[in-house]
Amino acid sequence: MYHHYFSTPKGFPRPFIHITADNNGIIGVDFVNQINEKERKNAHTEQCIKELQEYFNGERDNFSVILNPSGTHFQKRVWWQLGEIPYGQCWSYKELAIALGSANFCRAVGMANSRNPIALIIPCHRVIGHDGKLVGYSGGLDIKSWLLDYEKNGNSRKIG
């Protein structure tokens, strides 16, 4: 198992993004307040750090690092569909469910979204309630709000 920490830009709700990988790709991304483990890097974590730096510098709006999330077949379908939500836009859970084949999938889509182990890279923050309200985000609604504002306003918060 490999671990790497990314220092987030000033004003971001958490000081670090913790990246976890195995030999096949990134398996986890979460937002943390402190460094809890000694870093042990590999090519996947280093590529992820590079892409996060580019994202926060306004040079990247999607990620190409190799991902290897653990989940059910349906969860993985949802997570890959999340990658189709354009940068700077939001979809409702219903829109995401329809894109997956049925509006009846809303609850299942919400559950899969909540279990996304690679937050930000798999952009589950771009999913909102049908009424436009921010709902559910494993990293916290403060982070979800920050990311949506950052993407909507043209990367005006560059690390610099």
Identify the residue ranges that each predicted region occupies.
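Regulatory, non-catalytic segments
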Residues: 107-116
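Short Lys/Arg-enriched helix C-cap and helix-to-coil transition segments
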Residues: 120-127
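Conserved SAM-binding loop
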Residues: 98, 120, 136
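Short clusters of hydrophobic/aromatic residues that line enzyme substrate/ligand-binding pockets
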Residues: 63-67, 109, 134-137
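Basic nucleic-acid-binding alpha-helical/helix-turn surface characteristic of O6-alkylguanine DNA
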Residues: 1-104, 150, 154-160
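Gly/Ser/Thr-rich beta-alpha loop segments that engage phosphate groups in nucleotides
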Residues: 73, 90, 103, 112, ...
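…primarily DNA-binding HTH/wHTH and HhH modules…
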Residues: 130-160
